[in-house]
Amino acid sequence: MKKIILTGDRPTGRLHVGHYVGSLQERVRLQNSGDFDEIYIMIADAQALTDNAEHPEKVRQNILQVALDYLACGLDPAKSTLFIQSMIPELTELTFYYMNLVTVSRVQRNPTVKAEIQQRHFEASIPVGFFCYPISQAADITAFHATTVPVGEDQMPMLEQCREIVHKFNAVYGETLTDPQIFLPSNKACLRLPGIDGKAKMSKSLGNCIYLADSPEEIRQKVMSMFTDPTHLRREDPGHTKDNPVFIYLDAFSKPEHFAAFLPEYSGLDELKAHYERGGLGDVTVKKFLNSVMQEELRPIRERREMWAGRLPEVYELLRVGSEKARAKAAQTLAEVRYAMRIDYFEDGNLLK
């Protein structure tokens, strides 16, 4: 069996460092590992419209922004197929068939769906398209016979629901769909970065993000304004590093060479944490170090992004070619599904015999 990856992002805004440590850098590593036969990276515009139906221009404009972020982070169209979800109509047909295999109560029990309904204040009036997006995700994954789905920990219930659909379909119609496995980030600190305001989630809608496209000055301002330990009021006060956003970011981004270059008086992060926890280390010193680390890590990404931004026709062509390739793969899967369901009427030469 081929080893195939399917993953992607909703184009509701530029991607931020939470996306980078939570999924993008892992995708690039997997892409360059040579361990996978096919890799599909989807810009999920159709899914984005489930809660942005009245703002299609927002989705349209951000398709290009997400594509630029992908290329800037190192996703290579020669190794990974980058495509736009809505350009693959087969996904919609697969979603329709899978709806017959899932109950309303099962979707309602999905923890991710419940959390996102609450976050978007949809409790009183849930758009049907949004409510059904776990089924749409199952179509996305199975259309490419994905064996591996790199996602954040919060998406585990979605993949479990996808696997239930796969098992039900195969039990009813015969072995047709591939059972996918979740792939979590290898660095536990990178499962989810908090926002710079200390809130649990970095979110475009909350305005608490550091974007991959941010300028050096924007990065500096955001880092220096970050929430820290509220009990660490004075330099000499003992501080807490656990649940402290500045140290969570250092867990995710700092490397030994950063200490050698920017903070040589410390041997590494453990020594820095120990000093902060016993007192005598101010937040400004730690934030300045984090700023140096972030500038170093994000500089090459920003430079590649600026390079691709000057070649927009080429970016669109990459997306067009990728979408054509992805559609051919999805069409093949849809034919297999229709055959299994016995609704391939005009393809079945034995129908009238």
PLM feature segments, named:
Residues 11, 149-150, 208:
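A generic structural motif
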Residues 2-139, 257, 296-298, 305-306:
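N-terminal Rossmann-like or analogous alpha/beta NTP/dinucleotide-binding catalytic cores
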Residues 1-3, 346-347:
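Extreme N-terminus of proteins, especially the signal/transit-peptide cleavage junction
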Residues 111-115, 119-169, 173, 194-197:
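Internal, conserved structured core segments that host functional sites
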Residues 157, 163-353:
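Conserved nucleotide- and phosphate/pyrophosphate-binding catalytic cores
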